[in-house]
Regions:
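Alpha-helical cap/lid subdomain in secreted, periplasmic
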Residues: 31-34, 42, 61-235
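Serine-esterase "nucleophile elbow" of acetyl-processing enzymes
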Residues: 1-52, 57, 62-71, 75
Length: 235
């Protein structure tokens, strides 16, 4: 079984450590591979195709090269956090103007739909991850440090960072249901497992090693249940 993990920096394994964004070795595809290796009955190869700062526009552009031409059995698609983000330097320069997310919601959903359709046409099973939760207070502190406090009024007027993140996640869930594809609700898994401060790094959006571990375990559980269901059908 060949699995490609396709997404942005959360797939790549970026975390905010000691004041810097770093790629950590404890990323979710690496730990997922470890979990498969420990379990008898699984012969799985997990490939990390995460790229820092990617959004659904960029994923769509590299879909053929990074996924379809690799001929995996499954593609785990994780995207949305950068789509619903804003160009904070522009917001800081013009806090009284209207600003749109980097990838507007309708285009984001259409991109995800296109990715799913192309994967299915290539005989690849798509599995969509929900958006992991963020920590709005720490994220606001992080972007304010980079872009200035002039964005605070704009954020308050537009409903706050968590408003956009939640909106995109709810819309993604609705689309997944409409498409009838598999979903792994990593957002709920992280919220119910423990304190989010342990799972989200100091920039408020990227995960810690512990957070990536929870992500991996939830994904591994999905494949375990999938395997059990196949065995039951063969009895």
């Amino acid at each position: 079984m060949k699995i490609i993990c396709f997404g942005d920096s959360l797939t790549r394994g970026v975390s905010y450590v000691k004041g810097r964004l770093r790629i950590i070795k404890d990323n979710y595809p690496a730990y997922l591979q470890e979990l498969f290796s420990r379990e008898e009955g699984f012969n799985a190869s997990v490939i990390n195709k995460g790229v820092f700062n990617d959004n659904s526009d960029l994923l769509l552009k590299r879909l053929n090269k990074d996924v379809i031409e690799e001929h995996p059995d499954y593609a785990i698609v994780a995207v949305g956090g950068n789509d619903c983000n804003f160009l904070w330097n522009e917001v800081a320069e013009n806090p009284d103007k209207e600003h749109q997310p980097i990838v507007p919601l309708e285009r984001y959903l259409e991109n995800v739909k296109t990715i799913v359709t192309k994967l299915q046409s290539a005989g690849i099973t798509p599995v969509i991850l929900t958006l992991p939760p963020l920590d709005p207070v720490r994220y606001y502190t992080f972007i304010s440090g980079n872009s200035g406090i002039s964005i605070s009024h704009w954020i308050g007027r537009m409903g706050g960072i968590e408003h956009w993140h939640g909106l995109y996640n709810r819309s993604l869930n609705k689309l997944i249901k409409e498409l009838g594809v598999s979903k792994i609700d990593v957002r709920s898994a992280l919220k119910k497992t423990g304190e989010l401060i342990d799972f989200i790094s100091d920039d408020g959006i990227h995960l810690t090693s512990k957070g990536y571990k929870v992500l991996s375990e939830e994904i591994f559980l999905f494949f375990q249940q999938l395997s059990d269901a196949k065995e039951t059908r063969h009895i």
